[in-house]
Amino acid sequence: MIEDIQEDADRRMAKAVESLKHDLARLRTGRAHTSLLDQVNVEYYGMEVPIKQAANVSVEDSRTLAVTPFEKHMVPAIEKAIMASNLGLSPVSAGQVIRVPLPSLTEDRRKEMVRLVKNEAEQARVAIRNVRRDANSDLKDLAKGKDITEDEERRAQEAIQKLTDRYVAQVDDLLEEKERELMEV
């Protein structure tokens, strides 16, 4: 019973951290990385598919992505999809390769992005604390029903708190790393 509650809490906290990682990867930092285009879909044989399924996306240099379509006729469609993606990118076609230069971020935009990142991190922390609250509530219910002793409840709550601390520390590390990345010029 206690193990089930702890495993569930661990799984849900890990999910909150994964969600934060996913959200942070979408934010543009001014440095090229392939995950920047993960959310971009292109029409490929009548279906909307992620750009990765129609082209090879690679980092050419710190400010440029290279998109190489698997099929030559996909170049205009991929170019159009990147422009329509609301990422503020302007792809340049060079034969079979589409180069996507990343404009540098202004100081105001960097600060706004840091604010966004801090907000995302706080939401992840709140989600982790909510999982802790739910787990502790479940433990209290077990103790009230005399299914576990008070000592077992206290030990389990301490274990849940250690889990919470570990995942909140991961969130803080992700936040710090992303802030540093954003403020780099």
Curated annotation (Swiss-Prot):
Name under which the protein is recorded: Ribosome-recycling factor
Gene Ontology process terms (BP): cytoplasmic translational termination
Organism the protein comes from: Halorhodospira halophila (strain DSM 244 / SL1)
Broad class of the protein's primary localization: cytoplasm
UniProt keyword annotation of Nuclease present: no
Cell compartments where the protein resides: Cytoplasm
Annotated keywords: Cytoplasm, Protein biosynthesis
Molecular function as annotated in GO: ribosomal large subunit binding
Function: Responsible for the release of ribosomes from messenger RNA at the termination of protein biosynthesis. May increase the efficiency of translation by recycling ribosomes from one round of translation to another.
InterPro entries linked: Ribosome_recyc_fac, Ribosome_recyc_fac_dom, RRF_sf
The keyword Electron transport appears for this protein: no
PANTHER family to which the protein is assigned, alphabetical: MITOCHONDRIAL RIBOSOME RECYCLING FACTOR PSEUDO 1, RIBOSOME RECYCLING FACTOR
Pfam families attached to this UniProt entry: RRF
Cellular component GO terms, alphabetical: cytosol
Family to which this protein belongs: Belongs to the RRF family.
